[in-house]
Curated annotation (Swiss-Prot):
Source lineage: Bacteria, Bacillati, Cyanobacteriota, Cyanophyceae, Oscillatoriophycideae
Purpose: Produces ATP from ADP in the presence of a proton gradient across the membrane.
Gene Ontology cellular-component terms listed: plasma membrane-derived thylakoid membrane; proton-transporting ATP synthase complex
CDD domains, A to Z: F1-ATPase_delta (cd12152)
Keyword Phosphoprotein: no
Topology versus the membrane: Peripheral membrane protein
Entry-linked Pfam families: ATP-synt_DE, ATP-synt_DE_N
Compartment(s) where it occurs, according to its Swiss-Prot or TrEMBL record: Cellular thylakoid membrane
Keywords: ATP synthesis, CF(1), Hydrogen ion transport, Ion transport, Membrane, Thylakoid, Transport
GO terms assigned for molecular function: ATP binding; proton-transporting ATP synthase activity, rotational mechanism
Chief location: membrane
Name recorded for this polypeptide: ATP synthase epsilon chain
Biased composition (Basic and acidic residues): 101-115
Length: 136
């Protein structure tokens, strides 16, 4: 039995296929979804979503959204998403270093809005680096 997964952004379908298992970055922690999962609606955080195809795992970076499970269908509606195989480690590492520096600078200041923006950029860069295989 398989779980049908669709990852949808406002402008395209990033993933549409059957998987054995999915792990989502929910706002309350990592959430595993298997076939025959109970109906569920949850918020997603910025992070790495993993799907298992037979014995291989694929990573996708998701930038917040919602996930719905119903009748062996997992629909993931996100602001944006990238498949990990499409991200180069070098680019992801450069983005991560830049985001880390920006976050450190923002945390020295008192502008809360800039701190939040820098924190979001850091989470995105970290997720991209993880999906590219640069962080565990």
């Amino acid at each position: 039995m398989a779980l049908q997964v669709r990852v949808i952004t406002p402008d395209k379908i990033v993933w549409d296929g059957d998987v054995e298992e999915a792990i989502l970055p929910s706002t309350s922690g990592q959430l595993g979804i298997l076939p025959s999962h109970a109906p569920l609606l949850t918020n997603l955080d910025i992070g790495v979503m993993r799907v298992r195809l037979d014995k291989d795992w694929k990573s996708l970076v998701v930038m917040g959204g919602i996930a719905e499970v119903e009748q062996d269908i997992l629909q993931v509606l996100v602001n944006s998403a990238e498949i990990g195989d499409d991200i180069t480690k070098e680019d992801a590492q450069a983005d991560f270093s830049e985001a880390q520096s920006r976050l450190e600078e923002a945390n020295k200041g008192s502008d809360r809005r800039e701190q939040i923006k820098a924190s979001q950029a850091y989470k995105r860069a970290r997720a991209r680096l993880q999906a590219a295989g640069g962080l565990v």
